Amino acid sequence: MFDDDEYGFEAGREFCCDFLSNLYSRIYLPGNDIIQYGEDFPELYMIQEGIVVLSLKGIGPDNEFFILPTYSYFGDYQILYDLKSQILFKSGESKHLITMCLKNSKLKELMEDYPDARKFYRARAWHRRIELRRRMKKHLQKLNMKNQVKSKT
Protein backbone atom coordinates (compact mmCIF):
# COMPACT_ATOMS: atom_id res chain seq x y z
CA MET A 1 0.00 0.00 0.00
CA PHE A 2 2.86 2.38 0.79
CA ASP A 3 5.49 1.48 -1.77
CA ASP A 4 5.53 0.20 -5.31
CA ASP A 5 8.70 -0.73 -7.17
CA GLU A 6 6.92 -0.71 -10.53
CA TYR A 7 5.95 2.94 -10.12
CA GLY A 8 9.08 3.88 -8.17
CA PHE A 9 7.04 5.16 -5.24
CA GLU A 10 7.68 4.99 -1.53
CA ALA A 11 5.38 6.87 0.82
CA GLY A 12 7.06 9.06 3.39
CA ARG A 13 6.97 8.31 7.08
CA GLU A 14 4.67 11.25 7.85
CA PHE A 15 2.12 10.16 5.23
CA CYS A 16 2.19 6.58 6.55
CA CYS A 17 1.65 7.77 10.12
CA ASP A 18 -1.25 10.03 9.10
CA PHE A 19 -2.82 7.24 7.06
CA LEU A 20 -2.43 4.49 9.67
CA SER A 21 -3.53 6.61 12.62
CA ASN A 22 -6.93 7.18 10.97
CA LEU A 23 -7.79 3.54 10.28
CA TYR A 24 -10.66 1.78 12.02
CA SER A 25 -12.04 -1.74 11.79
CA ARG A 26 -15.30 -3.07 10.32
CA ILE A 27 -16.49 -6.66 10.57
CA TYR A 28 -19.05 -8.15 8.19
CA LEU A 29 -21.00 -11.38 8.54
CA PRO A 30 -20.65 -13.90 5.71
CA GLY A 31 -22.68 -12.95 2.63
CA ASN A 32 -23.34 -9.34 3.68
CA ASP A 33 -23.50 -6.54 1.11
CA ILE A 34 -20.76 -3.98 1.65
CA ILE A 35 -21.36 -1.64 -1.28
CA GLN A 36 -24.36 -1.97 -3.58
CA TYR A 37 -24.63 -1.06 -7.24
CA GLY A 38 -24.92 2.72 -7.66
CA GLU A 39 -23.72 3.64 -4.16
CA ASP A 40 -20.93 6.03 -3.21
CA PHE A 41 -17.96 4.63 -1.32
CA PRO A 42 -17.95 6.03 2.23
CA GLU A 43 -14.50 4.61 2.89
CA LEU A 44 -11.44 2.84 1.52
CA TYR A 45 -11.49 -0.83 2.58
CA MET A 46 -8.40 -2.93 3.23
CA ILE A 47 -9.14 -6.62 3.70
CA GLN A 48 -7.45 -7.92 6.83
CA GLU A 49 -9.16 -11.32 6.87
CA GLY A 50 -11.64 -12.99 4.53
CA ILE A 51 -12.63 -12.28 0.94
CA VAL A 52 -14.86 -9.88 -0.97
CA VAL A 53 -16.90 -11.14 -3.91
CA LEU A 54 -17.55 -8.73 -6.79
CA SER A 55 -20.75 -9.19 -8.77
CA LEU A 56 -22.41 -7.55 -11.72
CA LYS A 57 -25.80 -5.91 -11.21
CA GLY A 58 -28.26 -8.66 -10.42
CA ILE A 59 -28.38 -11.64 -8.12
CA GLY A 60 -26.91 -15.07 -8.62
CA PRO A 61 -23.58 -16.87 -8.80
CA ASP A 62 -23.36 -16.28 -12.57
CA ASN A 63 -22.94 -12.57 -11.86
CA GLU A 64 -19.88 -13.07 -9.64
CA PHE A 65 -16.80 -12.21 -11.65
CA PHE A 66 -13.93 -11.54 -9.27
CA ILE A 67 -12.77 -12.26 -5.72
CA LEU A 68 -10.62 -9.87 -3.72
CA PRO A 69 -8.45 -11.91 -1.32
CA THR A 70 -7.06 -11.12 2.11
CA TYR A 71 -4.62 -8.16 2.09
CA SER A 72 -6.15 -6.53 -0.97
CA TYR A 73 -8.18 -3.33 -0.94
CA PHE A 74 -11.01 -1.57 -2.75
CA GLY A 75 -12.74 1.78 -2.99
CA ASP A 76 -9.63 3.70 -4.04
CA TYR A 77 -10.52 4.63 -7.60
CA GLN A 78 -14.16 5.24 -6.75
CA ILE A 79 -13.18 7.73 -4.04
CA LEU A 80 -10.31 9.41 -5.88
CA TYR A 81 -12.36 9.88 -9.06
CA ASP A 82 -15.76 10.44 -7.38
CA LEU A 83 -17.38 7.42 -9.04
CA LYS A 84 -20.39 5.45 -7.87
CA SER A 85 -20.08 1.69 -7.69
CA GLN A 86 -20.83 -0.14 -10.92
CA ILE A 87 -20.73 -3.50 -9.14
CA LEU A 88 -21.85 -5.16 -5.93
CA PHE A 89 -19.21 -5.78 -3.24
CA LYS A 90 -20.18 -8.57 -0.84
CA SER A 91 -18.39 -10.48 1.93
CA GLY A 92 -17.57 -14.11 1.15
CA GLU A 93 -20.03 -16.80 2.19
CA SER A 94 -17.81 -18.97 4.37
CA LYS A 95 -16.44 -16.69 7.11
CA HIS A 96 -16.48 -13.21 8.61
CA LEU A 97 -14.79 -10.39 6.73
CA ILE A 98 -12.55 -8.09 8.73
CA THR A 99 -11.52 -4.82 7.09
CA MET A 100 -9.49 -1.81 8.08
CA CYS A 101 -11.09 1.35 6.74
CA LEU A 102 -10.20 4.95 6.03
CA LYS A 103 -12.99 7.50 5.61
CA ASN A 104 -13.56 8.90 2.14
CA SER A 105 -13.03 12.46 3.38
CA LYS A 106 -9.79 11.55 5.17
CA LEU A 107 -8.36 9.86 2.08
CA LYS A 108 -9.13 12.97 0.02
CA GLU A 109 -7.61 15.18 2.73
CA LEU A 110 -4.41 13.09 2.71
CA MET A 111 -4.23 13.39 -1.07
CA GLU A 112 -4.42 17.18 -0.76
CA ASP A 113 -1.78 17.28 1.99
CA TYR A 114 0.66 14.98 0.15
CA PRO A 115 0.85 15.84 -3.59
CA ASP A 116 3.44 13.15 -4.39
CA ALA A 117 1.21 10.51 -2.83
CA ARG A 118 -1.81 11.93 -4.69
CA LYS A 119 -0.05 11.60 -8.03
CA PHE A 120 0.93 7.99 -7.33
CA TYR A 121 -2.38 6.84 -5.83
CA ARG A 122 -4.48 8.44 -8.58
CA ALA A 123 -2.34 6.81 -11.29
CA ARG A 124 -2.44 3.41 -9.61
CA ALA A 125 -6.18 3.71 -8.92
CA TRP A 126 -6.82 4.46 -12.60
CA HIS A 127 -4.87 1.36 -13.64
CA ARG A 128 -6.79 -0.74 -11.11
CA ARG A 129 -10.06 0.59 -12.54
CA ILE A 130 -9.01 -0.33 -16.08
CA GLU A 131 -8.06 -3.86 -14.98
CA LEU A 132 -11.31 -4.38 -13.08
CA ARG A 133 -13.36 -3.16 -16.05
CA ARG A 134 -11.40 -5.51 -18.33
CA ARG A 135 -12.24 -8.47 -16.08
CA MET A 136 -15.87 -7.37 -15.90
CA LYS A 137 -16.15 -7.15 -19.71
CA LYS A 138 -14.50 -10.55 -20.11
CA HIS A 139 -17.04 -12.04 -17.70
CA LEU A 140 -19.92 -10.38 -19.57
CA GLN A 141 -18.67 -11.86 -22.84
CA LYS A 142 -18.50 -15.28 -21.22
CA LEU A 143 -22.07 -14.90 -19.91
CA ASN A 144 -23.31 -13.79 -23.33
CA MET A 145 -21.72 -16.83 -25.00
CA LYS A 146 -23.21 -19.10 -22.34
CA ASN A 147 -26.67 -17.57 -22.89
CA GLN A 148 -26.34 -17.96 -26.67
CA VAL A 149 -25.53 -21.65 -26.27
CA LYS A 150 -28.53 -22.09 -23.94
CA SER A 151 -30.88 -20.36 -26.38
CA LYS A 152 -29.76 -22.65 -29.24
CA THR A 153 -30.55 -25.80 -27.27
What are these regions (language model features)?
Residues 1-94, 105-106:
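Regulatory nucleotide-sensing modules
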Residues 1-33, 111-150:
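Cyclic nucleotide-binding regulatory module and flanking cytosolic helices
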Residues 62, 76-131, 135:
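Eukaryotic low-complexity, acidic/Ser/Thr/Pro-rich regulatory regions of large signaling scaffolds
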